[in-house]
A protein has these predicted regions:
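Conserved hydrolase catalytic core segment
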Residues: 93-131
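Conserved HGGG/HGGXW glycine-rich cap/lid loop of the alpha/beta-hydrolase fold
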Residues: 9-66
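Active-site nucleophile elbow and catalytic-triad environment of alpha/beta-hydrolase enzymes
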Residues: 172-187, 202-204
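Active-site loop/oxyanion-hole signature of alpha/beta-hydrolase fold enzymes
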Residues: 39, 45-49, 56-96
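Catalytic histidine-centered segment of alpha/beta-hydrolase-like enzymes
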Residues: 227-239
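Catalytic histidine neighborhood in serine/cysteine hydrolases
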Residues: 213-230
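Short beta-strand/loop motif that positions the catalytic acidic residue
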Residues: 191, 197-199
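N-terminal cap/lid segment of alpha/beta-hydrolase-fold proteins
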Residues: 1-11
Length: 249
């Protein structure tokens, strides 16, 4: 499958669906990859079935992409730039965007940094992230510290360690490298792109998702009923709401 270079880091991607279909970038969550997040959950099938051209990215540190052992390689602006580099590599001016969890945080950064490259964006499993302390705990657990008792850290460790493709040190660097101040009200208030925020109503990681949607002008909030952070992804309601939002373009 194809790779491309983004700032000296080799990244893996997948394309699916009709070549002339409206393109959409899919960006997965932390400790996941394109195949796990979007193929096994039948998102690729749903989107290509709706006539869309899917551009699936394995983020740096994940999947089949290169895995730097340096937190500075995982700044959110850098990872948002990777999505732009994919568009450049494919000679596309614009695309829709669908990101989940980490992929949604990357997408929000892209929405404020380079909105001209997107048509509309769906941000799933994202809330009001103020997680510097939690990120440190997750990194410690990924590095083998069994003294960490934080439930989220343990969840991510178990999820990551179960997959041989994962490099736990790269993932620790990734979670540490993404820590930065929240986007301020002025930057969120300047967003003009159509945005939808979608999250499971039982998702503790995406707490504050409705508030985030309220802070973005014109943004839509969709609650995925009865779902948590992990099982919201394959939910039919999530797919239906996303396809409806994309069809409004």
């Amino acid at each position: 499958m194809p790779d491309f270079d983004s700032g000296g880091v080799r990244l893996h991607y997948v394309t699916a669906g009709p070549e002339d279909g409206p393109p959409i970038i899919l960006v997965h969550g932390f400790c996941s990859d394109y195949q796990l997040n979007w193929v096994g959950t039948r998102w690729q099938e749903a989107l290509t079935g709706a006539g869309r051209r899917v551009l699936g990215l394995d983020c740096r540190g994940h999947g089949e992409s290169e895995k730097p052992h340096d937190p500075e390689a995982y700044d959110l602006a850098t990872m948002a730039g990777d999505a732009v580099s994919l568009l450049d590599h494919l000679r596309l001016e614009q695309a829709d965007y669908l990101g989940y969890s980490m992929g949604a945080r990357i997408g929000l950064q892209l929405v404020v940094d380079q909105p001209e490259r997107l048509r509309r964006a769906i941000l799933g499993g994202i809330g009001d992230w103020r997680g510097t302390r939690r990120a440190e705990l997750i990194a410690r657990r990924l590095r083998g510290d069994e003294g960490v008792k934080d439930p989220a850290a343990e969840m991510f460790y178990q999820f990551a360690a179960a997959r041989p493709v994962n490099d736990l040190e790269a993932l620790a660097c990734c979670i540490l490298g993404q820590q930065r101040p929240e986007l301020d009200e002025a930057r969120l208030g300047s967003i003009q792109l159509p945005v939808a925020v979608m999250a499971g109503d039982k998702d503790p990681i995406a707490r504050g998702a409705p508030d985030l949607a309220r802070r973005i002008p014109g943004a839509r909030y969709v609650s995925i009923e009865g779902r948590n952070h992990m099982n919201a992804v394959p939910a039919r309601h999530f797919k239906a709401a996303a396809l409806e939002f994309l069809a409004e373009a």
